[in-house]
Curated annotation (Swiss-Prot):
Keyword check for GTP-binding: yes
Listed Low complexity bias regions: 822-839
Coiled coil start-end: 336-386
Organism for this UniProt entry: Trypanosoma brucei brucei (strain 927/4 GUTat10.1)
Subcellular location: Endoplasmic reticulum membrane
Family statement: Belongs to the TRAFAC class dynamin-like GTPase superfamily. GB1/RHD3 GTPase family. RHD3 subfamily.
Name of the molecule in the record: Protein SEY1 homolog
Length: 854
């Protein structure tokens, strides 16, 4: 019989040649397509599914197996020509599709009535396998190939026909009982596997040829006794010791008249016999029990045949359920790969749009619809395979598609987060600047315990440097410094979190602000919660990265950063106005507070204490109706800013002794290279340590030099600005001008005029003298004088209000016209924007306290 070619469809294929080689899978696939629908219908195998059957035939050589199949199924298997020779005709195994008798179906259609006629379906495709005959001289006593074919037939065929001559019933060799013994053994081998389904047993159809008796029952009984005897003599597993042959086979019997002597009767019997295969209404219909079939989808048959034959030829233990499991995994893997490749193409198109900066409306919805379509296609392609394998692969496919979707959404979110970060750049910078300004003002209030009495020291121009060193002996309140560092980072954390909280909000009050943050993407993503979640996460990561880089830059230039704070604390008041010193005592008193403020900021630069931690979300928010798989994962990844506070980090601070010595570095703290993000880990993350021990020492000494130089310049300004009269001038003026002074004191009108003139023309001088009074006099006197001046100012506003008071106090207050340098990554300075002015009483109390501490 001619083999099947990939280009030309003939009536059958030589499935296994006489050398034991199976036809390639591609050729088997082409044959199946051609046999089912002809060329150009590549999806016919998928549409066929498991709706087909396979029938195989076994028997002795030259026993008429091919003749039986040709008569029964109208096939064209090659038959023996007795006129020329008797010998082997079928070598290996041939396969073709049966041509069912049109007369049978026409008869059924004629018997059908009404709706039954319309509902009647075409018969399912039937493939026929013609195996090489046994007991041939060509193979001799070699039964290995015979056993391989038997095992292959039982693993493929739903029904196995045993072709036997009626006259050989009751014989052993002539009836080919060796073949039956082989069939029983290999089928028992298949059934011995624990994964084998007991109901899935093949049908063994015994056909007695050339039967001339009237009653076939005695012959059937004899055949059954022969089967039972063979079954009893074979070695069985323990679980089948007491089992009968019916456990592993569904035995059926049929007799046919003599092919030559009773040809009309033979043809009639064959026609009736055919109904067993094609007519569901027939009481002997062979395909009524679906659990008996192999259940291999048509599109997986080539792979299944190849796997089974390879396992048989390699002498492996053939397990049909395992083979079906392997086939299911193979087909599911192919379908999964096709779905992933298709989704990759979709992702590539979207990636190009993202790189171009295009706005993609309803992005998540489009991706979800694509994934749902691919999952449905996968389900349709694999629904006929093993359910557990399909379910497992479908879950893996959904997870992989979800990962790809999430990656693409994050990529899109990052492109939008660039716009959001640009809009929030000022917020990020101001959070640090505000924290530094707060620290600068509050650190001045840290109590210093004097370690040396320097009240009697006088600093002249020549002994300036030594005087500065002598005053820098204050002991630092270490506990309060640590609290300031903690509060510094908490303020930054709260400021940033407050700015980023609205990115996760969807209230109407936030929509206007969000629109300005999202820019051109606002309209497209306001209704896309998954993208908004991704943008919020990406923006927070970007802010964390940007903020950390800024502190790294500040730490790299720590001396200049700390010196800027020292300089601003020294030359400005707590309300932001400029402070001018008239005396060296006032300057040296403020210098200790300013130096303390710089040291506390240095403690803040030791360790970067912010991190992103997951946020617990409500189950309803994650699993609510309409929630996409991408949104569920993004919501679970929602995070917030938090100050690092594990046990080791709570103690990882600089220890200050006094303002003139290098702070003690916490060298004993355990560190770890990998940041686990676990707040319970008792380690310090080495990547977040901004200042090493050596860097701290270098920064402190350089800062001290800069601070000393700044102090010297301020002292020189004070010394150069001193304008004082000789001590003898005032007594002489009082003595010589006593008469004029007496006349002035006794004339109220003239006295009032002189006071008004002095206030108007000597206001600046009087203020400077008041500042000198504040710096040199005791605190009780300063407070009393300022209280008196405040009462006078209140009386003036009550009885002679100025234009500013009449206008509601809208007059401009004094501020330093020069802008101070801000703390940035480049200069590591501190921005000094003017804060709201404190009340006069509060300012007096604060300055008085400073003087008292001095």
């Amino acid at each position: 019989m001619a083999a099947f070619s990939g280009e030309t469809a003939v009536k059958g294929i030589h499935l296994i040649n006489d050398d034991g080689e199976l036809l390639p899978e591609a050729d088997i696939n082409d044959f199946l397509i051609s046999a089912l629908a002809g060329k150009g219908s590549s999806d016919i195998l998928y549409r066929t599914g498991v709706n087909y059957h396979v029938v195989g035939v076994f028997g002795g050589q030259s026993s008429g197996k091919s003749t039986l199949l040709n008569s029964l199924f109208q096939t064209e298997f090659m038959t023996m020509d007795e006129a020329h020779h008797r010998g082997q005709t079928t070598k290996g195994a041939f396969m073709t599709r049966a041509i069912l008798d049109a007369q049978t179906h026409r008869k059924e259609r004629e018997e059908g009535e009404g709706a039954d006629l319309l509902k009647r379906e075409k018969p399912q495709p039937l493939f026929v396998l013609d195996f090489e005959g046994t007991d041939g001289i060509e193979r001799g006593e070699d039964q290995n190939f015979e056993r391989q074919l038997s095992l292959f037939a039982l693993s493929v065929a739903d029904i196995l026909i045993i072709n036997m001559w009626a006259v050989d019933v009751g014989r052993f060799n002539a009836a080919n009982m060796n073949l039956l013994r082989t069939v029983f053994e290999v089928n028992l081998q298949l059934f011995s596997h624990g994964s084998y389904v007991k109901e899935e047993k093949p049908t063994l159809l015994v056909v007695l040829r050339d039967f001339t008796e009237n009653d076939p029952a005695p012959s059937f009984e004899t055949v059954r006794k022969s089967f039972d005897k063979i079954w009893g003599n074979i070695q069985k597993p323990e679980s089948f010791t007491d089992a009968t042959i019916d456990v592993v086979f569904d035995l059926r019997y049929r007799v046919l008249p003599h092919y030559k002597l009773q040809r009309p009767e033979f043809d009639s019997a064959v026609s009736e016999f055919r109904e067993w295969f094609v007519s569901p209404k027939n009481s002997n219909f062979l395909f009524s029990n679906c659990s008996m079939f192999r259940g291999v989808p048509a599109d997986g048959m080539p792979s299944y045949l190849s796997n089974c034959w390879n396992a048989i030829c390699s002498s492996k233990d053939l397990d049909i359920p395992t083979q079906r499991d392997m086939l299911a995994r193979h087909r599911c893997a192919d379908a999964k790969h096709a779905a992933i490749e298709e989704f990759k193409e979709v992702c590539e198109e979207y990636t190009k749009k993202i790189q171009r900066g295009d706005v993609i409306p309803q992005f998540t919805r489009a991706l979800e619809e694509t994934i749902e379509r691919l999952l449905k296609n996968f389900s349709d392609q694999t629904k006929l395979y093993k359910v557990s394998v399909v379910h497992e692969t479908a879950e893996a496919l959904e997870e992989e598609l979800g990962d790809m979707e999430l990656h693409l959404l994050k990529q899109y979110a990052k492109s939008i987060a660039v716009t959001v970060l640009a809009a929030l750049d000022g917020v990020i910078g101001s959070s640090v600047d505000e924290a530094v300004r707060w620290l600068q003002n509050e650190a001045r209030s840290v109590l210093l315990l004097e370690g040396k009495d320097n009240k009697g020291d006088r600093i002249d121009g020549g002994g300036l440097a030594q005087g500065v060193l002598d005053t820098a002996e204050g002991l630092v309140d270490n506990k309060r410094c640590r609290l300031f560092v903690e509060e510094f980072w908490k303020r930054i954390c709260l400021s940033l979190q407050g700015a980023f909280d609205m990115l996760n909000g969807c209230s109407k009050s936030h929509q206007a602000a969000l629109s300005s943050l999202y820019g051109k993407f606002a309209t497209a993503i306001m209704d896309d919660q998954a993208v908004r979640e991704g943008v919020a996460h990406a923006a927070m990561e970007g802010a964390q990265h940007k903020l950390r880089n800024r502190f790294v830059a500040m730490a790299e230039n720590a001396a200049e950063t700390v010196h800027q704070v020292f300089e601003q604390a020294l030359t400005s008041k707590t309300d932001g106005t400029v402070r001018f010193f008239r005396t060296t005592d006032g300057l040296l008193g403020a210098e200790k507070q300013a130096r303390q403020a710089g040291l506390v900021l240095l403690g803040c630069l030791l360790y970067y204490r912010l991190k992103l931690v997951p946020v617990e979300v409500d189950a309803g928010e994650v699993e609510g109706e309409g929630t996409t798989r991408a949104l569920q994962r993004l919501v679970r990844d929602r995070c917030r800013f938090q100050v690092r506070d594990n046990r080791t980090e709570k103690n990882f601070f600089l220890h200050f002794t006094n303002i003139s010595d290098v702070p003690r570095y916490p060298l004993d703290a355990p560190t770890s290279v990998v940041d686990s993000g676990d707040t319970t880990a008792d380690t310090v993350n080495a990547d977040n340590v901004l200042l090493s021990h050596n860097a701290l020492q270098c920064a402190f000494h350089l800062y001290k030099q800069k601070a000393d130089f700044t102090l010297q310049m301020q002292l020189r300004n004070i010394e150069s600005g001193k304008q004082s009269l000789p001590p003898w001038v005032l007594p002489v003026m009082l003595l010589l001008g006593w008469n004029e002074l007496y006349y002035l004191l006794t004339s109220p009108i003239l006295l009032i005029a002189i006071i008004v003139i002095a206030v108007l023309f000597f206001k600046t001088f009087l203020k400077s003298q008041l500042e000198v009074l504040e710096e040199k006099c005791p605190v009780w006197l300063v407070v009393s004088v300022k209280a008196l001046l405040q009462q006078a100012q209140a009386l003036q506003n009550a009885y002679a209000p100025t234009e500013a008071v009449r206008g509601g106090g809208g007059g401009a207050q004094f501020r330093d016209p020069t802008q101070a340098t801000s703390v940035s990554g480049a200069s590591a300075g501190v921005s000094s924007e003017s804060s709201s002015a404190a009340s006069p009483r509060r300012r007096v109390c604060r300055e008085s306290r400073d003087k008292g501490e001095d």
